[in-house]
Regions:
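N-terminal Sec-pathway targeting helices
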Residues: 1-14
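Solvent-exposed, non-transmembrane regions of membrane-associated and secreted proteins
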Residues: 14-144
Length: 144
């Protein structure tokens, strides 16, 4: 009976150790798969947009950036400003505003509005109050 119990305990300890060792690998694979899918879905949505829609989205983002430059940073945006911010560059309605490619490590990571824990679990967060990532003189996009 003692051998049977010790065998069960040894098996549980082994499985626990194996789970702890495999968790980082499985977690990285899972996140990479979902990030790749998010980038692919976003790219498809952008390809479906006509040139006029793309230009309008870019113009709205540039206008937002210009407003930040002229008004200065605000620590507590109004509800209207929050709604506007969340709608900018959100082509597929998921909160994703673009993606960043890092060729050295062959990685494409989605960029989402905000820096809440839920956002940072799935991609890169854009800090509200900084310029949107569309470029331009005097703009400074901050990603987390």
């Amino acid at each position: 009976m003692r051998k049977h119990i010790s065998t069960i305990i040894a098996g549980i300890i082994f499985l626990t150790g194996l789970s702890l060792l495999l968790y980082p690998t499985i977690s990285n694979f899972w996140n990479s798969k979902h990030q790749t899918q998010a980038v692919a879905d976003y790219s498809k949505q952008i390809e479906k947009m006509d040139d006029q829609e793309k230009e309008q989205a870019l113009a709205a983002a540039e206008k937002y950036n210009q407003t930040l430059i002229t008004n200065g940073g605000r620590f507590t945006p109004s509800e209207e400003e929050d709604t506007l911010y969340d709608s900018l560059l959100d082509a597929n309605g998921t909160g994703m505003m673009g993606y960043i490619t890092i060729p050295e490590i062959r990685c494409k990571l989605p960029i989402y509005h905000g820096v809440e824990d839920s956002v940072l679990q799935v991609g890169i967060g854009h800090i509200e109050g900084s310029s949107l990532p569309v470029g331009g003189k005097g703009t400074h996009c901050v990603l987390s």
